[in-house]
Amino acid sequence: MKFAVIVFPGSNCDVDMFHAIKDELGEEVDYVWHDTENLDEYDAILLPGGFSYGDYLRCGAISRFANAMKAVQKAAEQGKPILGVCNGFQILVESGLLPGALMRNENLKFMCRTVQLRVENNETMFTSQYEKNEIINIPIAHGEGNYYCDEETLKQLEENNQIAFRYVENPNGSVSDIAGIVNEKGNVLGMMPHPERAVDELLGGAEGLKVFQSILKQWRETYVVNA
C-alpha cells in the first residue's frame, strides 16, 4: 500500500505522519508537495497537522485552494481513504469534504496534552481495529479545535453514525464532545487529536497506531484478498 503525506507551507506534523507509516506500519509513503495535481499512484492520502500558510484568514482557508486539494477531492470521490489530522481536519472542513467548522477553543488557549477518546464507531475503514466504546489516549495540540455544526448537521452525523471519536472529557468546547467525524461515504476522516504521535510506546503510547492499521486492513481486504 502506498501513502501520500501532503506537505503545505507551514505543515509541521508531516514527519510524524511519515514515521508512522514507514517505520511503524511498514508501508510505502512519499512526501507530496501541495502543488501536485495528480495523486493517482497513491492508495491513501494523509493531511498532516501544522499551521498551513500561517493559518491566515482561518485555519485551512488558504490551503483549500492548493492544487493538491483538487486531487484530494478526486481521490475522495474514488473512495480512497483520506485522513486529515488537526490542521488537516480544518482543511477538509474548509474544502467541503466534511461538514461543520473548527473554531477557537472555548478557553481561548492553545492546548497541548494527552486526552482520552472514546471510539464511537468501529465500523469505519479507520477504526475497525478498535473495540466500540474503547477508551484510548491520544495527544492534542491545537488552538482552534472547537468543532461546531448546527443542530440539523449534528442530527445527521448521529443518525448516519458519522461520529468516529468523542472526547471523554471535552477539552475545547466541541459540540457533542466530537473529536473526529467521517463523511457519509465513510472514506474521509477528520480528527483533531494526533494518532501519528501515539504509534510507539517509547513516545508515550501506541494507541493511535490502530487508525493506520485499520486503513491497511481495509485496503488489503479490498485489493489483495480479492485480487
Curated annotation (Swiss-Prot):
Transmembrane portions of the chain: none
Pathway assigned in UniProt: Purine metabolism; IMP biosynthesis via de novo pathway; 5-amino-1-(5-phospho-D-ribosyl)imidazole from N(2)-formyl-N(1)-(5-phospho-D-ribosyl)glycinamide: step 1/2
Pfam family, one: GATase_5
Top-rank taxon, per record: Bacteria
Keyword Lipoprotein attached: no
Localization of this protein: Cytoplasm
Active site residues according to the UniProt entry: 86 (nucleophile), 194, 196
Swiss-Prot/TrEMBL catalytic activity: N(2)-formyl-N(1)-(5-phospho-beta-D-ribosyl)glycinamide + L-glutamine + ATP + H2O = 2-formamido-N(1)-(5-O-phospho-beta-D-ribosyl)acetamidine + L-glutamate + ADP + phosphate + H(+); L-glutamine + H2O = L-glutamate + NH4(+)
Chief location: cytoplasm
Any single GO CC term annotated in Swiss-Prot or TrEMBL for this entry: cytoplasm
Gene Ontology molecular function: any one: ATP binding
GO biological process, one term: 'de novo' IMP biosynthetic process
PROSITE patterns found in the cross-reference section: GATASE_TYPE_1
Subunit structure: Part of the FGAM synthase complex composed of 1 PurL, 1 PurQ and 2 PurS subunits.
Cited function: Part of the phosphoribosylformylglycinamidine synthase complex involved in the purines biosynthetic pathway. Catalyzes the ATP-dependent conversion of formylglycinamide ribonucleotide (FGAR) and glutamine to yield formylglycinamidine ribonucleotide (FGAM) and glutamate. The FGAM synthase complex is composed of three subunits. PurQ produces an ammonia molecule by converting glutamine to glutamate. PurL transfers the ammonia molecule to FGAR to form FGAM in an ATP-dependent manner.
Name of the featured protein: Phosphoribosylformylglycinamidine synthase subunit PurQ
Organism lineage: Bacteria, Bacillati, Bacillota, Bacilli, Bacillales
